[in-house]
């Protein structure tokens, strides 16, 4: 059964401008430790890809927060929600801490799709209630 859906579109130029103003602090606020390591690696080699990586993570986390109905309120935090990828390349959401507990208590599962182009990143998220 569908528990919730969420979508988000992010202007990559806005993320770029925020990075120019706030530097790495912005990435540290939004990204998990694993995501931060990937962001740093990409940013060093291809600065534009680093910005788009941050924008896609921002977008996916916003879409997820809408799908679970919490928005950016506890237990939903930027760093407790990690966008990872399966061996196949498919994006996955990995939850940590109180958000993971909240999600598992409700027997939920999640599907996420992420895309980006030069100026925009977009995400769509479907959360299902599992009937075991």
Swiss-Prot record:
Protein purpose: Transfers the 4'-phosphopantetheine moiety from coenzyme A to a Ser of acyl-carrier-protein.
Essential cofactor(s): Mg(2+)
The protein's enzyme class: transferase
Protein name (database record): Holo-[acyl-carrier-protein] synthase
Record's catalysed reaction(s): apo-[ACP] + CoA = holo-[ACP] + adenosine 3',5'-bisphosphate + H(+)
One Gene Ontology term from the biological process aspect of the record: fatty acid biosynthetic process
Example of a GO cellular component annotation carried by this entry: cytoplasm
Keyword Cytoplasm: yes
Binding annotation for Mg(2+): 8, 62
Protein origin, superkingdom: Bacteria
Molecular function GO labels: holo-[acyl-carrier-protein] synthase activity; magnesium ion binding
EC number: 2.7.8.7
Protein's organism: Polaromonas sp. (strain JS666 / ATCC BAA-500)
Pfam family membership, one: ACPS
Keywords: Cytoplasm, Fatty acid biosynthesis, Fatty acid metabolism, Lipid biosynthesis, Lipid metabolism, Magnesium, Metal-binding, Transferase
Family to which the UniProt record says this protein belongs: Belongs to the P-Pant transferase superfamily. AcpS family.
Subcellular location: Cytoplasm
């Amino acid at each position: 059964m569908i528990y919730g859906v969420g979508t988000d579109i992010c202007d990559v130029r806005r993320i770029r401008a925020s990075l120019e103003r706030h530097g790495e602090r912005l990435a540290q606020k939004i990204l998990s430790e694993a995501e931060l390591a990937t962001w740093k690696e990409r940013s060093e080699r291809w600065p534009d890809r680093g910005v788009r990586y941050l924008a896609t993570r921002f977008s996916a986390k916003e879409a997820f927060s809408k799908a679970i109905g919490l928005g950016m309120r506890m237990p939903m935090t930027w760093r407790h929600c990690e966008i990872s990828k399966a061996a196949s390349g498919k994006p996955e959401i990995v939850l940590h801490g109180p958000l993971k507990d909240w999600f598992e208590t409700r027997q939920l599962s999640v599907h996420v799709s992420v895309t980006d182009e030069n100026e925009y990143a977009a995400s769509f998220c479907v959360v299902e209630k599992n009937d075991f």
